[in-house]
Amino acid sequence: MEKQYLTFISFCFSITICGFLIVSWLARSIIRNGIRTLTWRKETKRKKKNQEDENKMSLLDLPDLTLDCILEKLSPSELCAMTSVCSELRDKCVSDHLWEKHMETKWGRLMGDAAIQEWKSHVATIMRCLTSSSSSSRKSKPNWSSRFVANLKPFAWLSSNHGCENRGSSSYLAPIDSVMYWYSNLENGKFWFPAQVYNRENGHVGFMMSCYDAKIRYDFKTDTFQARYSAHGRRAAEEKVTWQRLRPSQDDTKSRDLHVSDCLHGLRPGDHFEIQWRRTKEFPYGWWFGIVGHLQNCDGVQNCRCDSDENVVMEFRQFRPESPWRRTVIKRKDHRETGNEENGFYGGVKKLGTEEEISTWKQLWPSQALE
């Protein structure tokens, strides 16, 4: 009896061991097949992805002409954003031919010869500093020039004006003598440049219908300008000067130089002109708008001979008829500065030849006559 019991126990144990081995074998087979299936699927996906990647075209794979056409359509902020994509695109996006269009569109009207010369002088000064510091840095450890360039952040205007914040400043660094760097310095107000301001000091009555030289810089937050006027004594300043009140500085005549009047013999009644005027000889000239009038003995209708007279009447019709500032008379021949300490000094004259110049002045006309 006892022998039969031991035989039964041995048989059950053998069956259990066999069952366990069978289950283990099945489990290993399932796991092995599962891993093999997963590996196959992953490999298939990888091959498919590689195939798709091979079929995709990169922007840099485009012909140069096509890529340039695309980049030319981008705004300044978009061009700046593209510089952070890769070095190849950065080199393309900082090229002058892409930025010249943006410069001309926004800043061309104000970039006269004087402003351009000012920028060239500014760049030359920076380049001299960099060259000098580069040579001196070879003798000492600190590389001042590299720190200087690294701290040039000309695209600060992007963060608040164009939504390009959180981009590394190094990706925006452009060559100092590039149009992109020039544009960026104008945009962020780093560069003061010469221009002329109509109706200075917020349209102060003493400057209505005049235009004065100033140094200006842009404020991108308000889309207006700050202006500093050069004068005898205190230096006047003004904020929130609009685009409409600005024109490029005239490089041919400095604010303290007498303009050569080569138009006097051709002036006729009704012609529009600008004339230099200053309060005293210590002050710089401003340009004042006027209209050629008739002589006192002419009725302005019949037998008018004002155009052949040796004198020419300069009228400033923004003033009341009884105002001492209403008119002055100058000689056509050998005209020099004329005037006195009471009424100021009149300088050179230039005739306005385009309708655009005349309409600009008329838009600034005061709402009521001045005293």
UniProtKB/Swiss-Prot annotation:
Name of the molecule in the record: F-box protein At2g41170
Organism ancestry: Eukaryota, Viridiplantae, Streptophyta, Embryophyta, Tracheophyta
Domain F-box: 56-102
Xref: SUPFAM superfamilies: F-box domain (SSF81383)
Coiled-coil zones: none
Organism field: Arabidopsis thaliana (Mouse-ear cress)
